[in-house]
């Protein structure tokens, strides 16, 4: 058993570690809320783009929402473990932080590896959406209209892509291709945007996903601090047989 003097010397160290870990855990909890918000924002703001991507890509917002929720719950547990100054709970907290970090690392690697597949998938699906486009508006046709009107573009690579579609042969260009709102372009190429949507969509997705990736990377690195603090506090409590109830 540690001597009284040793325990008196250790008490300030444990108190300091406990205070720092509580501050960290609160910030960590906030990052969970941020990830949850980013996931919801991504689902809403990128919904039109995701509807033309493969199933793997559409899961990205749900992964962020799920991760944010787990972090919120884990942060609550970490706060409780720190307040209780429980060595085994702090070890469990550090273990969970490590698992989440590894999952985020694997997800980042997978996302980087399959980024070209996402681009190819979008281009292929967008081309098919143009071929099957109809004015009554299934979800893919609505997505095409939303993208073209929002990004002021027409077709995949340029407006000429529409000329090979059934819709063009029957009606002409869709209204979403118009340069000016409320026009009826029919087959008049002067009334529609010339630039295609593929490059613009990829630029938008890369920009938006860059924000998501940056936040996710920051959260992942931040977890390393928590792992270190939780481990140090747990070890200090165990080695010195000191427990605060």
UniProtKB/Swiss-Prot annotation:
It comes from the Eukaryota. Its main location: membrane. It is a multi-pass membrane protein. Residues 1-19, 81-93, 230-245 are cytoplasmic. SUPFAM superfamilies: Tetraspanin. Pfam families: Tetraspanin (PF00335). InterPro entries: Tetraspanin/Peripherin, Tetraspanin_animals, Tetraspanin_EC2_sf, TSN6/7_LEL. Glycans are attached at residue 134. It is found in: Membrane. Keywords: Glycoprotein, Membrane, Transmembrane, Transmembrane helix. Residues 41-59, 115-208 are extracellular. Gene3D superfamilies: Tetraspanin. One of its GO terms (cellular component) is membrane. The chain crosses the membrane at residues 20-40, 60-80, 94-114, 209-229. This is Tetraspanin-6.
